[in-house]
Amino acid sequence: MAAALATSFFCGAAPARAQVTSEPSAVVFPDPAKFATGLYTEGEFGGLWFNGPAGNDIGAGFAVGARVGYDFVRFFALQAHLVGSTHQTQGDSAVAGQLLQMYQATVEAKATLRLVQLSFFAEGGLGFARMSSNLLYALGIARYRTGLTAGGGGGVDYHFLSRHFSVGLRGGYYVLTEVHNSRDGMVTTYLRYTF
């Protein structure tokens, strides 16, 4: 062992010499042209609240949703959106403290402005909203459990260096036609995968 150490000490390698022939290359920014386009899916979660008469009797709730869409060109897409949320009635009525779920299904158009890894978008569409029970009828706010909904929103999307994944934050505002003069607002964060 001592002989091996002595040999490596006295017969060690010569000092290394390196030659620099050019400056190091700059950081390579991602090329948005290489980001995947076409069919995509999104999973989202966040909060949903009611405005108008329904907002006085129904508290804000947790929302979970999904989107499936198709980018026809880099700046325009069509998508189907499903979201469900759970709420609790509030106030001093006989139905206070009861749980209520709302389900919304919409078909939306989406316009996007891409700036390297960031993109800003606006979206809007039409669809249906359905309540899980007749609590709103008991409160005198709605006649039917199912009705039309229309609205829109927008947000920001951050694309990773991977060509398939991005994350984002979006907000939306929808009119509920069967809930007297009421609307719902939603803020969600999402993960997107483009095939």
Task: Give the residues covered by each predicted segment.
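Short coil/turn motifs at beta-sheet boundaries
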Residues: 34-36, 59, 100-102, 117, ...
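Outer-membrane beta-barrel biogenesis signature
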Residues: 13-42
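Gram-negative (and chloroplast) outer-membrane scaffold detector with strong preference
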Residues: 42-47, 62-139, 147-150, 158-160, ...
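Short glycine/proline-enriched turn or capping motifs at secondary-structure junctions
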Residues: 164-165, 178-189, 193
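Solvent-exposed loop/turn segments connecting transmembrane beta-strands
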Residues: 52-62, 93-95, 176-184
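Bacterial N-terminal signal peptides
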Residues: 2-12
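Internal, hydrophobic beta-strand segments that form the core of beta-sheet-rich folds
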Residues: 170-172
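Gram-negative and organellar
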Residues: 20-29, 128, 150, 154, ...
